[in-house]
Structure formats: structure tokens, C-alpha cells
UniProtKB/Swiss-Prot annotation:
It comes from Sodalis glossinidius (strain morsitans). Belongs to the AIR synthase family. It comes from the Bacteria. One of its GO terms (molecular function) is phosphoribosylformylglycinamidine cyclo-ligase activity. It is an enzyme of class 6 (ligase). It catalyses: 2-formamido-N(1)-(5-O-phospho-beta-D-ribosyl)acetamidine + ATP = 5-amino-1-(5-phospho-beta-D-ribosyl)imidazole + ADP + phosphate + H(+). It is found in: Cytoplasm. Its EC number is 6.3.3.1. Pfam families: AIRS, AIRS_C. GO terms for biological process: 'de novo' IMP biosynthetic process; adenine biosynthetic process. Keywords: ATP-binding, Cytoplasm, Ligase, Nucleotide-binding, Purine biosynthesis. This is Phosphoribosylformylglycinamidine cyclo-ligase. NCBIfam families: purM.
Length: 345
């Protein structure tokens, strides 16, 4: 071999300088998320975090998630500023349903070719989600992998750790017949069902930017960031008895509510207790989707389902209203009368 060409990592498609520029861009917003328990800053091999001193028997709760194919829609529409909020929401909402306070968050951002502006927008959204949920963004990984992703396409994943007092873990074991089921309103489809969303858009030949649904573009409805319920739910838990909380994600009503129901109980939901938001009505009509499939794929406007003792219903609704949440009585827990743990009627 006689060619004396000297190859570099950049020639292979990995731009270390771009990665360093990204770190410089995000330092400020990441710093805004710091909690007093966090030791050190960005740049270490690992992040250090002490447990809050208020806990007597602290139990760590962890979770990891992504945003699914909502990312594809965001990339197609070149809207990257709220995807990071979605990522945090999917993780921290899974923690808080067990009564846990999120402590810290880490992200993974992978792409074929690093676009600093896009990555900075995504990570700024992650920092915003961390601020909304009160957890610290303590680190992450930015992986530029030419040949693994097409061009500047990217994927994100998140990992979160929280803490709960052992005696205060919410696991559904206290749920009993007669409990009231409350709903917390969703901002839209959140981060689930987007493969079906994209199929409906293709099937109906719809341009989401040009299609108006109740005064705003369909794109705005579909890319609305996932609600982060952490502060509202922690406040509710601190003020009244809560028996269970279900985060309506993939699998919708049929699969998520049973995860917090003990044997011998059944959730009976009143379908007339709320009207589906316009975006779900549009999706159902445009895709000719059955109601059963809608309930299985989407949250249909319900982000969280909360089981409380019947005599705590009014108090819980008042607390949630004071916190600015839209909440209502969704149904009730009944003794199980068959194989189905969720009945919508």
C-alpha cells in the first residue's frame, strides 16, 4: 500500500469538535436542573448523588423509556424543541405512580451525523422536563454513529432514578371495591400510538401542518409535549390517601389499569364522564379506527387514572383543581365479576 493519506475520526464521520460544541451549548440549561443532593457537574465518568436526608427508609425506584415513533413525526416536521420533554415525562411519570420523587435523569442521544442545533434543541427540552419534574439532569451520552442511522436522523432514550419512603410505596395493594377512579387530563396522545398516527396520516393523505383541528394545526395537536404530572401527584399523595395510580401509556386502558389492580377487583369506567379531545376524534374518523382499538392504543384524553377511597373523592378533586389540573370522576372499583379487569360502558 503506497497511499500516504492520513485518515482521521472526522473522515470516518465522527466529529469530536461538534460533540464538544454541543456540550458547551447545553451546559447552562443543564446547570439549571441541579438538586442539592447532586455532587459535581458535567464531565465526570459518573454522576454522584446523595439520598435526601428526609427519608428514613429510602427505596430507589428506576425507569427507562423512549419516545417511540413520535420522533419520526418530529423529524419530518423539523420540530425538535419538545421531544425532550416527552422523553423525561415518559420516565418520571412511571416513577411518580409508585409514589416516588424523581432524583436524577440521564439521556442517550444517537444519530448518524450530529447536528448541534437539533441536538441542543432536544437536550434543552430534556432540561425543561427535568425542571418541571424537579429532577437533576446529571449526564448523558451523545453517540454519532455513521452507517447506523440515516443522515441526521436520531433516537433518544432516558433513564431516571427516584426515591420513595418504604412505608409510602403505592403499589395498588390497597385498592378495594368502592374506590373512586379519577382521571387527569392528557395534553394529547402524549408519546404512544404514533405508528398508528403516522399510518392514519399516510392512509388519509393528510398534511398535519395544513390541517386544522379546532383552531390549531393537527401538527400542534400531535406534537404537544407529554404532560408531566410529578409535582401535582406528589402534592396529592402528601395531602390525601391514594390507593393506586396508573399511567396510560402503550396498551392504553386495557393494559395499564390492570397493572395496579389486585385480584378480585375490576375497574368500571363511565365512557360518558368525558369527551375525547378533538385530536382523538379526528384520528378515529380519519383512520376508521374502532373504539376498542382506540382505547387499546391511545389515552383518549386521560393521562393518569387515580384510585382513591370514596370518601376522599371531593378532597382529591379540590386539591387537583387548586394545582391547575383538569380532573374528574372517571369510574369506580367493583368486585370482579368475570375475566375482564377493565370495563368501559
Amino acid at each position: 500500500m503506497t497511499d500516504k493519506t492520513s485518515l482521521s475520526y472526522k473522515d470516518a464521520g465522527v466529529d469530536i469538535d461538534a460533540g464538544n460544541a454541543l456540550v458547551d451549548r447545553i451546559k447552562g440549561v443543564v446547570k439549571q436542573t441541579k438538586r442539592p443532593e447532586v455532587m459535581g457537574g458535567l464531565g465526570g465518568f459518573g454522576a454522584l448523588c446523595a439520598l435526601p436526608q428526609k427519608y428514613r427508609e429510602p427505596i430507589l425506584v428506576s425507569g427507562t423509556d423512549g419516545v417511540g415513533t413520535k420522533l419520526r413525526l418530529a423529524m419530518d416536521l423539523k420540530r425538535h424543541d419538545t421531544i425532550g420533554i416527552d422523553l423525561v415525562a415518559m420516565c418520571v411519570n412511571d416513577l411518580v405512580v409508585q409514589g416516588a420523587e424523581p432524583l436524577f435523569f440521564l439521556d442517550y442521544y444517537a444519530t448518524g451525523k450530529l447536528d448541534v442545533d437539533t441536538a441542543a434543541a432536544v437536550i434543552t427540552g430534556i432540561a425543561e422536563g427535568c425542571k418541571q419534574s424537579g429532577c437533576a439532569l446529571v449526564g448523558g451520552e451523545t453517540a454519532e454513529m455513521p452507517g447506523m442511522y440515516h443522515g441526521e436522523d436520531y433516537d433518544v432514550a432516558g433513564f431516571c432514578v427516584g426515591v420513595v419512603e418504604k412505608a409510602d410505596i403505592i403499589d395498588g395493594s390497597k385498592v378495594q371495591a368502592g374506590d373512586t377512579l379519577l382521571a387527569l387530563a392528557a395534553s394529547g396522545p402524549h408519546s404512544n400510538g404514533y405508528s398508528l398516527v403516522r399510518k392514519i396520516l399516510s392512509f388519509s393523505q393528510t398534511d398535519p401542518e395544513q390541517t386544522q383541528v379546532e383552531g390549531k394545526s393537527l401538527a400542534d395537536h400531535l406534537l404537544a409535549p407529554t404532560c408531566i404530572y410529578v409535582k401535582a401527584l406528589l402534592s396529592l399523595i402528601a395531602q390525601t390517601e391514594v390507593h393506586a395510580i396508573a399511567h396510560l401509556t402503550g396498551g392504553g386502558f386495557w393494559e395499564n389499569i390492570p397493572r395496579v389492580l389486585p385480584a378480585g377487583t375490576q375497574a368500571v369506567i363511565d365512557k360518558n364522564s368525558w369527551q375525547w379531545p378533538a385530536v382523538f376524534r379526528w384520528l378515529q374518523q380519519a383512520g376508521n379506527v374502532s373504539r376498542h382499538e382506540m382505547y387499546r392504543t391511545f389515552n383518549c384524553g386521560v393521562g393518569m387514572v387515580i384510585a382513591v377511597p370514596a370518601d376522599s373523592t371531593a378532597k382529591a378533586l379540590a386539591i387537583l383543581a387548586d394545582l391547575g389540573e383538569t380532573a374528574w370522576v372517571l369510574g369506580q372499583i367493583h368486585p370482579a365479576d368475570g375475566e375482564h379487569q377493565v370495563i368501559i360502558r
